[in-house]
C-alpha cells in the first residue's frame, strides 16, 4: 500500500513528508506490523533519534501488532529502558505477544489502550529440526527466554511471576479493562482529551 504524503505550508514554502516522518516530528512512533529485525531496527533508530532531539520530552509509541520475534522485540524493549526520554505506550487494535510486553514496558502512568483494543500474552514458541543435541540446546534456550519474559512482565505489571507463568501457558486474551486490572496498562482512553487530563494529574 502506498505511504500517504502530507504537505505542510509555512509562509511561501511547502514541504512534503511521508506520514510516518510527519508523525515523528510530533514524537509519535507507530508499530503497526509484526515485529522482526528490520522493524526493530527502525523503531530503535527512531527512539534514539527522538532522545537525541530532547532527552526529557515524552515519546509516544502506538502499538497495533500481533507480536513476532522475541529477540527483535527485546531490542525495542531494551532501547525503551535505555533512553532517558519517557516512553508512553498506547494500544490500538491489538498488542499481542511481544506487542503486549512492549505495551506494559511504557513509563509508569503512561501506558494506555483504546476501548476496543485487545491484549494477548503467551509463552514464546519455536519449532526445531536437526540432531537431538541441537534440539535440546534450542529447547533449553526457549525455557530461558520464557523465564526472562515472565520476570519482565511481572516487574512491569506488579503480578507475581508465578501467576504470569501460569497465565502465559496458553494464549491469554484481555480487553482493556482486564489489562488495566492485570497491570499491563494504566488507563483506557476514549479520546485525546483523556490523555491530556491524565498527564495533568
Swiss-Prot record:
Matching InterPro entries: ClpP, ClpP/crotonase-like_dom_sf, ClpP/TepA, ClpP_His_AS, ClpP_Ser_AS
Primary location class: cytoplasm
GO molecular function, a single term: ATP-dependent peptidase activity
Compartments it resides in: Cytoplasm
Reactions catalysed according to its record: Hydrolysis of proteins to small peptides in the presence of ATP and magnesium. alpha-casein is the usual test substrate. In the absence of ATP, only oligopeptides shorter than five residues are hydrolyzed (such as succinyl-Leu-Tyr-|-NHMec, and Leu-Tyr-Leu-|-Tyr-Trp, in which cleavage of the -Tyr-|-Leu- and -Tyr-|-Trp bonds also occurs)
Tree of life domain: Bacteria
Enzyme class per UniProt: hydrolase
Active-site feature positions: 97, 122
Transmembrane segments: none
CDD domains associated with the record: S14_ClpP_2
The enzyme's E.C. designation: 3.4.21.92
GO biological process terms on file: protein quality control for misfolded or incompletely synthesized proteins
GO cellular component terms, semicolon-separated: cytoplasm; endopeptidase Clp complex
Keywords recorded for this protein, A-Z: Cytoplasm, Hydrolase, Protease, Serine protease
Database matches in PROSITE patterns: CLP_PROTEASE_HIS, CLP_PROTEASE_SER
Subunit structure: Fourteen ClpP subunits assemble into 2 heptameric rings which stack back to back to give a disk-like structure with a central cavity, resembling the structure of eukaryotic proteasomes.
Record function comment: Cleaves peptides in various proteins in a process that requires ATP hydrolysis. Has a chymotrypsin-like activity. Plays a major role in the degradation of misfolded proteins.
NCBIfam families: clpP (TIGR00493), PRK00277.1 (NF001368), PRK12553.1 (NF009205)
Family classification: Belongs to the peptidase S14 family.
Name of this protein: ATP-dependent Clp protease proteolytic subunit
Organism: Nitratidesulfovibrio vulgaris (strain DSM 19637 / Miyazaki F) (Desulfovibrio vulgaris)
Gene that encodes it: clpP
Amino acid at each position: 500500500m502506498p505511504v500517504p504524503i502530507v504537505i505542510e505550508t509555512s509562509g511561501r514554502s511547502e514541504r512534503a513528508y511521508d506520514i510516518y516522518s510527519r508523525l515523528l516530528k510530533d514524537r509519535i512512533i507507530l508499530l503497526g506490523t509484526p515485529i522482526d529485525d528490520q522493524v526493530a531496527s527502525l523503531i530503535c533508530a527512531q527512539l534514539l533519534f527522538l532522545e537525541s532531539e530532547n532527552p526529557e520530552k515524552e515519546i509516544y509509541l502506538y502499538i497495533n501488532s500481533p507480536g513476532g520475534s522475541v529477540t527483535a522485540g527485546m531490542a525495542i524493549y531494551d532501547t525503551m529502558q535505555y533512553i532517558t526520554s519517557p516512553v508512553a505506550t498506547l494500544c490500538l487494535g491489538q498488542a499481542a505477544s511481544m506487542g503486549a510486553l512492549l505495551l506494559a514496558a511504557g513509563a509508569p502512568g503512561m501506558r494506555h489502550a483504546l476501548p476496543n483494543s485487545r491484549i494477548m500474552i503467551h509463552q514464546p514458541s519455536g519449532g526445531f529440526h536437526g540432531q537431538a543435541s541441537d534440539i535440546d540446546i534450542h529447547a533449553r534456550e526457549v525455557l530461558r527466554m520464557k523465564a526472562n519474559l515472565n520476570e519482565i512482565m511481572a516487574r512491569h505489571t506488579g503480578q507475581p511471576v508465578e501467576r504470569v507463568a501460569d497465565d502465559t501457558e496458553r494464549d491469554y486474551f484481555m480487553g482493556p479493562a482486564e489489562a488495566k486490572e492485570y497491570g499491563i496498562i494504566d488507563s483506557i482512553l476514549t479520546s485525546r482529551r483523556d490523555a491530556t487530563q491524565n498527564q495533568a494529574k
